[in-house]
């Protein structure tokens, strides 16, 4: 059992009056307490039990429990339910129904558009549910939905196991997995959701569901998005052996204009097309500078990797190589800032290659070159992601590249200008005919977001699950799956 238990959580929130859950905290299998008993019509659950603490806006601890990673999200729920068990989640749903409140779900709080919060409703915060257990024989990891990636890595890596996922340390495992989950190792092993073997969930009616009894829930949880029709409490995922080594290089080019940036991007697309599955690359433009990241868990002198390094080094102003180190030492290099931050990030679509994005590049490059704080990035996908046969709702396996547009600021004036620039980049992307987007990089301005994130057929299937699991549309956000009809 990991040290990241509910007891750890309560120590850190004791100032909020959270000396609750006292009995449950010592349990070794904390999520599987008896189901919450039904309440009489109109009755409210107690404000504090061993399973859940309801925080009002005036309570100490509310601000910390509400805080999203995106500091610009100002939504303020009426109450935040800090849930330590499935029974606590059930009690939270009971209160939401009694108060007729909408429900949002918060784990890591990294939703770009603040979908883990709402105004005047209830937020079910599962961050106390952070127990981790690794079966040493099967390599299966059972994790509470509130676990963060840093905790997962710190738990698994010393045991010689690894879960392919993203790199941001404070991202919640639940949200990452449900939306897909990709990173530097997805080309080798597939998406995080491809490793999902089972889950437990409290649906919108307050009923505990197990994917062993409802296989369509497992299908939906493999890339079908977050906050639609249930609150995941526990995930079981297949881990991998830790790679023996990790190598990385950065190639930097300075003082670029549109012509040189386009030429460098064309060379990058050509070089990445030949990379082995062990390798990952990202092309990142910030102002007039481009940084290209290359990583591999395979041989550093593998033919295609060596060719990539030679080709990109010849076009770059500076090349640097990190020491070859175990993954336990290299992962923290990519953890990113702890947050919160002021930003506006959005999916910039999936591509098959340069031709798909070429028409949008002049407009994108103009914005990035003239607006400090803007970043345009393209990441390699493909590899095992394209070959994976696991049944799931993630629909974009055939596209080997994923773009993202990012803006960061520290003053309101810059926020307005950069948000407008992101909007223009989004328009350039749409006019180029790019319509597929990653659900974990949402944007409220996407017009046909159901098709963009999930595809039409998958979305209709998700709607059928919504109708069964949340017929009152209790769990919702601006881009949650709608009830059919």
Predicted feature locations:
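Soluble FAD-dependent oxygen oxidases
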Residues: 2-485
């Amino acid at each position: 059992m990991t040290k990241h238990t509910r007891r750890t959580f309560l120590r850190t929130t004791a100032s909020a009056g959270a000396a609750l859950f006292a009995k449950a905290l010592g349990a070794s299998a904390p999520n599987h307490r008896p189901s919450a008993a039904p309440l009489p019509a109109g009755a409210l659950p107690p404000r504090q039990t061993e399973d859940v603490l309801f925080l009002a806006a005036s309570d100490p601890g509310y601000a910390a429990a509400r805080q999203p990673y995106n500091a610009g999200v100002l939504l303020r729920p009426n109450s935040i339910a800090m849930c330590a068990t499935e029974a606590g989640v059930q009690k939270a749903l009971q209160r939401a129904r009694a108060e007729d409140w909408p429900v949002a779900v918060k784990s890591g709080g990294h939703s770009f558009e603040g979908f883990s919060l709402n105004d005047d409703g209830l937020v079910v915060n599962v961050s106390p549910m952070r127990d981790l257990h690794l079966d040493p024989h099967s390599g299966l990891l059972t994790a509470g939905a509130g676990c963060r990636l840093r905790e997962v890595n710190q738990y698994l890596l010393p045991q010689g196991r690894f879960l392919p996922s993203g790199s941001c340390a404070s991202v919640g495992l639940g949200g990452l997995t449900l939306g897909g989950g990709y990173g530097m190792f997805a080309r080798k092993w597939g998406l995080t959701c491809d490793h999902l073997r089972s889950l437990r969930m409290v649906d919108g009616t307050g009923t505990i569901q197990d994917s062993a009894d409802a296989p369509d829930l497992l299908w939906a949880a493999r890339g079908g998005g977050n906050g639609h029709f249930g609150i995941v409490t526990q995930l079981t995922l297949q881990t991998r052996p830790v790679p023996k080594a990790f190598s990385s290089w950065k190639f930097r080019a300075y003082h670029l204009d549109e012509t040189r940036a386009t030429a460098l991007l064309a060379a990058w697309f050509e070089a990445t097309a030949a990379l082995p599955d062990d390798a990952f690359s990202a092309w990142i433009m910030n102002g007039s500078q481009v940084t290209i990241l290359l990583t591999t868990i395979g041989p550093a002198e593998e033919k295609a990797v060596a060719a990539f390094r030679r080709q990109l080094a010849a076009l770059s102003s500076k090349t640097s190589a990190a020491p070859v180190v175990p993954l336990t030492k290299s992962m923290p290099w990519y953890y990113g800032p702890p947050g919160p931050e002021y930003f506006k990030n959005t999916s910039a679509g999936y591509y098959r290659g340069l031709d798909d994005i070429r028409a949008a590049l002049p407009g994108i490059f103009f914005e990035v070159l003239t607006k400090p704080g803007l970043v345009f990035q393209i990441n390699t996908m493909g590899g095992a992601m394209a070959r994976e046969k696991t049944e799931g709702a993630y629909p974009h396996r055939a596209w080997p590249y994923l773009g993202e547009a990012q803006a960061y600021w520290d003053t309101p004036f810059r926020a307005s200008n950069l948000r407008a620039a992101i909007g223009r980049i989004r328009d350039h992307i749409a006019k180029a005919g790019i319509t597929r987007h990653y659900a974990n990089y949402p944007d409220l301005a996407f017009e046909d977001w159901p098709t963009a994130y999930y595809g039409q057929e998958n979305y209709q299937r998700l709607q059928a699950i919504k109708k069964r699991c949340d017929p009152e549309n209790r769990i919702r956000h601006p881009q949650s799956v709608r009830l059919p009809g």
